[in-house]
Design a protein with these regions (language model features):
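Bacterial N-terminal signal peptides that target proteins for export
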Residues: 1-8
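N-terminal accessory segment at the very beginning of proteins
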Residues: 3, 20-247, 254-256, 260-269, ...
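Short alpha-helical "patches" and their helix-cap loops
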Residues: 5, 618-625, 758-761
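Bacterial N-terminal signal peptides
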Residues: 8-16
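N-terminal signal peptide c-region/cleavage motif recognized by signal peptidases
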Residues: 16-18, 561
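Catalytic-domain carbohydrate-binding cleft regions of carbohydrate-active enzymes
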Residues: 113, 117-651, 655-656
């Protein structure tokens, strides 16, 4: 048989002798099979593969990719039309080879193939990709059973797990599932599909099967051997989270639930009286009445006689209010009026094949379920959210959004079955609130708490949490793994109910657990205590002022944490990062079994104590030299393990040698007291050059990144044989140019002979008892270089 092939370049314009095409799409109509392979380069590091039957005429579902990725710069590629094989290569060396006869696809970098698509279109709802032996895989959304997902079957069907604990197999499937994984070799795969599916992560293959009504497409995301780069590229593809409201980086109190206005005001007053900083309070379902009133979505006047005054008073105290809503409108309570109003409008989900609202039964009653795929539903919810926001509600909490109860008999307005639409429900629900803020309050940064969704959820300013975890040591222990896998999946703000939510009636109170959990919360993206009872830190008086000191410490780290938020918004980097995040070429694997340590940004390592009764723990150190922040004279080398003393008041915490850690060392009642122009800059000495970039903007506007209304302040250290030279220089605008810094050098055991600032000697302020060197610096124009010399 004569070999026939067809290579179609979309809008082909070949550049003479160069092999470059202006458009980055290659289409191969296979010879021996009735399907067409289309390869599209979305960037120099990302390719999309579509394998479509030639006679397929179905409707394409929405893609998981964001508009920016789909409509961005068209990358330049080289396309070669071989006799047997057609090849596309991006400028970064990512190559896709298609066997013209049958459409077999190989994707790789350089001479190495990462993946081979061995079964194109044999079954349009199934994709099998062969990978190299010995790889580990991470991500896939909120997964708590293990950090390394290799050898597992990952089901993608969002599921609530009430009261879960470490080691339970149900933690393999949680509230936010994503059809994606990242390989330890530094590449990732995203299947462009939100329907119910499974991904078998085998020893040498990824087998993906879905209920989707369309052929499965997928993206291969190259990181050039580094997981860090894969995360950057993946979040560019599906969207990144914008800068958060600053108050979300403070302390938030929450409970199931504050039952009335008097109790809520009492909690706020007690926290303030006891000296706790406070930035938010979360109202569970009692704000609208009782459990059976779900879907009422208006303040209960009996329990909250003057909620408007309460909201005003809280605002004056710097306390933001977050209120809950759910997908259901029940008919066995006072939400019946809303049900009767909305049912004739087609707002609720229908039974498949009928025009009848499908009755959904949950744990407190029955009623209708909002069909958020319906424009009428979105319009009604948006109007209700707007009216409550106008009254003073600051943030929104979407609960039960898996959806927790989603009968299979439902057919959604968009034509999809419950199984097909289930995972996307949380994304579309979040977008209702996000769009409200973008269009009605464009200068306000939204705070949206959601516990369910799929890939790209973060682009709607979502602050997820790990749902109703058990208040137990077993519930505490998987939280690091959950934050790690979620963070690699784009969910940079994944957090947890600090203290544990689901109570054991036989042991409601465990002070040691609460303190250790609070220590983990100190270095979690959101510090929010939440439980069914005894949620607030002032209940644990047996530990004196330790709970207050932990929460106050959160505020001292605001400048560092806000810079992490900038890194997340600008690069997609999670706040919580695995120990091997900066390793390359499979070296991340050496740390994948360390499930109770993590990097907090690039320069800090956290090792929480997560075992009951423990007063010490083993600690493993990744690449670099690490300085004990608690005892800065102690240093540890890479790839070593030590046993570290950690009584209840000690959180093991380490800084990378050479790190600059900005801190706000003054008392705050809330983040409104934060002054980014008055900071301590902790420099942890190193014999190697180092640098750090501090982010500085007005702390509130939504356009500071896009409009360039911010400063990047760079700190650099250049050690020499006889001194350390430190330079400070900013660039940009939009914030005060004058800065009052205090450069702190902890762990400096020998008093320096002199210190100079911009060539002038300054008085030595050296305390040998800590030891620490303090250098006050007044900078009149941060965009001018300031030079500090510490002479040995």
């Amino acid at each position: 048989m004569k070999l026939y092939r067809m290579i179609t370049l979309v809008a082909v314009v070949l550049m003479a002798m160069s092999g470059l095409a202006q458009q980055a799409t290659m289409t191969v109509k296979t010879v021996n099979h009735p399907w067409t392979v289309t390869v599209t380069a979305l960037s120099d590091d990302i390719v999309r593969v579509d394998v479509m039957p030639n006679d397929w005429k179905g409707t394409k579902l929405p893609t998981l990719a964001c508009d920016k990725a789909l409509n961005g710069r068209v990358p330049k590629v080289k396309i070669n039309e071989g006799t047997q094989v057609s090849t596309m290569v991006t400028e970064n060396g990512l190559s896709v080879k298609v066997l013209n006869s049958m459409g077999l696809i190989k994707v790789g970098h350089g001479d190495a193939d990462y993946l081979v698509d061995v079964m194109p279109m044999r079954d349009s709802s199934r994709v099998v990709l062969v990978h190299n032996a010995g790889e580990s895989f991470y991500g896939a959304g909120e997964r708590g059973y293990s950090f390394n997902l290799a050898g597992d079957t990952l089901v993608n069907y969002n599921t609530q797990n009430y009261g879960y604990q470490m080691g339970e197999k149900r933690t393999k499937l949680m509230g936010i599932t994503m059809p994606m994984v990242i390989s330890s070799k530094g590449y990732g795969v995203l299947f462009d599909d939100f329907c119910k599916s499974s991904l078998v992560v085998g020893g040498q293959q990824l087998e993906y099967t879905s209920t989707t009504p369309q052929p499965i497409s997928y993206y291969v995301i190259d990181g050039n051997g580094r997981v860090e780069n894969v995360v950057k590229n993946f979040t560019w593809l599906v969207g990144r989270q914008e800068l958060p409201p600053l108050w979300t980086l403070g302390y938030i109190t929450s409970k199931y639930g504050y039952r009335d206005q008097r109790e809520s005001e009492g909690v706020v007053d007690t926290l303030k009286r006891e000296g706790y900083p406070l930035d938010g309070i979360v109202f569970d379902l009692y704000w609208y009445g009782k459990e059976e009133d779900m879907g009422r979505l208006e303040w209960d006047k009996q329990q909250w006689p003057d909620h408007r005054k309460m909201l005003r008073d809280f605002k004056e105290k710097g306390v933001n209010v977050v209120t809950i809503s759910q997908p259901y409108v029940l008919t066995n309570g006072r939400a019946i009026d809303n049900y009767r109003l909305l049912d004739p409008q087609g707002i609720f989900c229908k039974t498949d094949g009928t025009d009848t609202t499908h009755t959904v039964t949950i744990w407190v009653g029955q009623g209708g379920m909002f069909d958020v795929s319906n424009p009428a539903t979105r319009q009604w919810l948006r109007a209700r959210y707007k009216s409550l926001t106008e009254e003073g509600v600051t943030g929104w909490w979407g609960d039960l959004g898996e959806p927790e109860k989603h009968p299979l008999e439902i057919r959604h307005y968009n034509g999809l079955t419950a199984e097909q639409y289930h995972n996307m429900y949380g994304n579309d629900w979040s977008r209702i609130i996000y769009d409200l803020f973008k269009e009605e309050y464009p200068d306000r940064r939204p705070m949206i708490m959601m516990r369910a969704g799929t890939a790209g959820l973060q682009r709607y300013s979502v602050f997820p949490w790990s749902t109703d975890v058990s208040r137990s040591w077993g519930g505490f222990q998987p939280q690091v793994t959950i934050m790690l896998n979620s963070g690699l999946s784009g969910l940079g703000y994944m957090s947890h109910d600090v203290g544990g939510f689901a109570l054991d009636e036989n042991k409601k109170r465990d002070g040691e657990l609460y303190i250790r959990w609070l220590e983990l919360g100190l270095f979690s993206p959101v510090l929010r205590t939440h439980s069914q009872d005894l949620a607030e830190p002032y209940h644990y008086t047996e530990y004196g002022d330790l709970p207050r000191r932990i929460i106050c410490e959160r505020y001292r780290w605001l400048p560092y944490n806000y810079t992490l938020a900038y890194e997340n918004a600008s690069q997609g980097l999670p706040l919580v990062r695995p120990l091997g995040f900066y390793e390359r070429d499979n070296n991340i694997k050496r740390f994948e079994n360390v499930s109770d340590q993590y990097l907090w940004g690039h320069d800090v390592m956290v090792a929480p104590v997560m075992t009951q009764g423990a007063t010490s723990r083993n600690i493993t150190f990744p690449d670099g030299t690490w300085v004990d922040i608690n005892i800065p004279s102690n240093r540890y080398n890479a790839h070593t393990t030590i046993n570290y003393d950690a009584p209840i008041e000690v959180l093991p915490l380490f800084a990378r040698a050479g790190a600059f850690i900005p801190q706000a060392s003054y008392k705050m009642d809330n983040v409104g007291d934060y002054n980014p122009s008055k900071l301590d800059i902790m420099y942890y000495m190193s014999d190697e050059p180092s640098e750090y970039t501090l982010f500085d903007d007005d702390l509130k506007s939504t356009g500071t990144l896009a409009e360039g209304k911010h400063r990047l302040i760079r700190f650099a250290a250049a050690p020499a044989t006889d001194k350390w030279v430190i330079t400070i220089k900013g660039e940009g605008a939009g914030t005060p140019a004058k800065k009052e810094y205090r450069l702190m050098v902890p762990g400096l055991e020998v008093k320096p002979s002199q210190v100079k600032v911009n060539g002038k000697k300054v008085k030595l302020n050296y305390d040998p008892t800590i030891p620490v060197l303090r250098i006050p610096i007044t900078i009149n124009d941060i965009n001018e270089t300031t030079t500090v010399e510490i002479v040995k």
